[in-house]
Each structure stands twice: as structure tokens, then as C-alpha cells.
Swiss-Prot record:
The gene is grpE. Keywords: Chaperone, Cytoplasm, Stress response. It comes from the Bacteria. It comes from Malacoplasma penetrans (strain HF-2). Pfam families: GrpE. This is Protein GrpE. Participates actively in the response to hyperosmotic and heat shock by preventing the aggregation of stress-denatured proteins, in association with DnaK and GrpE. It is the nucleotide exchange factor for DnaK and may function as a thermosensor. Unfolded proteins bind initially to DnaJ; upon interaction with the DnaJ-bound protein, DnaK hydrolyzes its bound ATP, resulting in the formation of a stable complex. GrpE releases ADP from DnaK; ATP binding to DnaK triggers the release of the substrate protein, thus completing the reaction cycle. SUPFAM superfamilies: Coiled-coil domain of nucleotide exchange factor GrpE, Head domain of nucleotide exchange factor GrpE.
């Protein structure tokens, strides 16, 4: 009887141990599955984070590229503005330089003429100024051509006003010393004694051999023609 009970107890104990083993195995399997699910979830989150990082990196790269492109365009604009300013400054400097050179030459001519005039005035007779006057008349004629030209630059216009002042000063000087303009008007008959024909042109409703345009004024010293008036004559 005791043997049977002992045997029965042993069997129950073995079954109980087996049941515990089975339960432990089930728990381990469930734990493994939970861990696997957790790893899968972590993998998905990590993939999203990496994709987000890559997207942010691409956006930053695009922003940097746009900034560089904008900086390059701004640099080109600034370079062009500097070139334009430099050209304007060079043009202005060139105009001032030419005007200064003309002023210097004019001052030299005035001094030369005054010195020569004062010397000749003492020793020459009535027409002693002829050669000097012709040279000066040519200068005055060039001044008048420059003054009568149309300009839009204010600085050049101011220099031309200065040229006009010098031309007027010389004309007064001429009058004081017997040098006068030869009177020539449009539609006057061409007079070879006081005029020279620059060219002839057809002029409708105008008789032949008439003055239709005055190119340069003529001058005489007392009764001698120094420089004939240059005109265009009708055919």
C-alpha cells in the first residue's frame, strides 16, 4: 500500500515539474515574440528618423545652394555697378582733362598774342598785326563752332560758356584794334573779294550765285581782308 502511494506521489511530482517546464517554455516564447515585436518597432522608428534626417539634409543643401546662387548674382550686380561707375568717372575725367588742355593752350595763345601784339604795336605800321590776327581769328572761329554745337552734358556746356566768354573778349580786342567782321547775310550775292565758296548746292526758289549758308565769318583789318567769309552758294 505504501509503495502505491509513493509511486502515485512520484508521478504527480513529475507531472507537476513537467507542467512548470511547459509554462516556462511558453513564457520564454512569449517573451521572445514580444522582444521581436519591440525590435521591429524600433527598426521602423529608426528608418523614419533616418529618412527625416536625409530630408532635412537635402533641404539644408538646397538652401545653401540658393544662398550661394543669390550671393553670386549679387556679386555680379555689384561688379557691373562698379564698372558703370568707373566708365562714368573715366568719361568725366577725360572731359575735364580735354577742357583743361584746351584752357591751357588758350592761355598760352593769349599770352603769346598779347606779347606779340605789344611788341608789334610799338614798331609796326597800320597792318602789322595781319599775320597774328589771322592766327587768332582761326582760334576764335573754332571757339564759335564749338559754342554753336549742341551738347546735353551740363559740365561740357559750362566749359562752352567759358569758350564763349573768351570769344567775346577777343572780338572786343579785335574792334579796339581795327579788326572787324565782314558783313555777309543770307541771299547776298556771292562776292569773291570778301567770300570763299565752300561748295555749291541746288536751292529751290533761290536764284543762282546766292549765299544760302554761312560756314565761317570773315574778318578784315581796316580795309584789307584778313580772312574771307566761308559760305555755301546756290547753283
Amino acid at each position: 500500500m505504501e509503495n502505491k502511494n509513493q509511486k502515485h506521489n512520484n508521478e504527480f511530482h513529475e507531472k507537476n515539474q513537467q507542467s512548470q517546464k511547459d509554462n516556462n517554455n511558453v513564457k520564454k516564447e512569449n517573451l521572445h515574440e514580444d522582444q521581436s515585436d519591440l525590435n521591429d518597432a524600433n527598426f521602423d522608428d529608426g528608418g523614419k528618423k533616418n529618412k527625416l534626417k536625409n530630408d532635412i539634409k537635402k533641404l539644408n543643401h538646397l538652401v545653401d545652394s540658393l544662398k550661394n546662387e543669390n550671393n553670386n548674382k549679387q556679386a555680379k550686380i555689384e561688379s557691373l555697378e562698379r564698372q558703370i561707375n568707373l566708365l562714368n568717372e573715366n568719361f568725366k575725367s577725360e572731359v575735364i582733362k580735354k577742357a583743361s588742355e584746351a584752357q591751357t593752350k588758350l592761355d598760352e595763345k593769349i599770352k603769346e598774342f598779347q606779347a606779340k601784339y605789344e611788341t608789334e604795336l610799338k614798331h609796326a605800321k597800320k597792318y602789322a598785326l595781319k599775320s597774328s590776327a589771322i592766327e587768332l581769328i582761326d582760334i576764335v572761329s573754332n571757339f564759335e563752332l564749338a559754342v554753336n554745337s549742341k551738347v546735353t552734358n551740363p559740365e561740357i556746356a559750362n566749359y562752352l560758356k567759358g569758350f564763349q566768354m573768351f570769344a567775346n573778349m577777343f572780338k572786343n580786342y579785335f574792334q579796339q584794334n581795327g579788326i572787324t567782321e565782314i558783313p555777309v547775310n543770307l541771299n547776298d550775292d556771292f562776292n569773291a573779294e570778301v567770300m570763299q565758296a565752300f561748295e555749291t548746292q541746288k536751292a529751290p526758289n533761290t536764284q543762282p550765285n546766292k549765299v544760302i549758308k554761312i560756314i565761317k565769318k570773315g574778318y578784315k583789318l581796316h580795309d584789307i581782308v584778313l580772312v574771307p567769309a566761308t559760305v555755301i552758294v546756290s547753283e
